[in-house]
Amino acid sequence: MHNYLTDLTDNQWQSIEKFFDCKRKRKYELSAIWDGILYVIKTGCQWRMLPKDFAPWQTVYYYFRQWKYAGIIEVILEEVVYKIRESVNKSPSPTVGIVDSQSAKTTAVGGFSIGYDAGKKVKGRKRHIVTDTLGNLLVVEVHSASYADRAKGFDVISLAKDKYKTIEKVFADGGYTGSLIDQVKQKLNCKLEIIKRTDKGFKVLPKRWIVERTLGWLSNDRRNSRDYEFSPLTSEAIIQLSFIKVALNKLFK
């Protein structure tokens, strides 16, 4: 029996239990499997280094892969976003999004979609996210860091618009200027509003700080301190799980 800070409480697990087949008898409870995944994400340890009081690492990793490819993690993300919005009397589906990106170094593991971000001087991948005005993670796309924000901005905004069709406006920084504004308007029937820096020095910019705070939340998990994954899809699942834990902590304080 383990008792780590990353473990879900009974209330937290019960809120997402319906997404799993818990009726079939198993050697290891699915809640314990989930706890093992969260431990890896929080501590940044290798799967093979998972403490022995969890299920065998092979079992934990197997279920992580299954839930990733089955889309269960993504569905749970939508559920917790809905519940947080409902808890503050917001409509279930947002009308406003905020887009931003974060470049992360990759490791010797290598993998797909790795490039060089000349602006940040980072070799690795870029995490592109869209949040709502509460900072809830709506969508994430991980791709090579070599792509400029405006080059991949349409893709991630399109993902958000496809999942949350009520989105009418998206806020972004100056990296998303140019033809992207017209592209978003014409193809997605959505307004892209650019918030630019107007002076030097530190200044909290409207809306921008919200998405930057979310990126900060995600960075609290050591697995996100760099991109350790071979596949961008795995990186996306790790980020989704990181926010799910943040959301569950908010919902069940």
PLM regions: where:
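Short alpha-helical elements
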Residues: 1-253
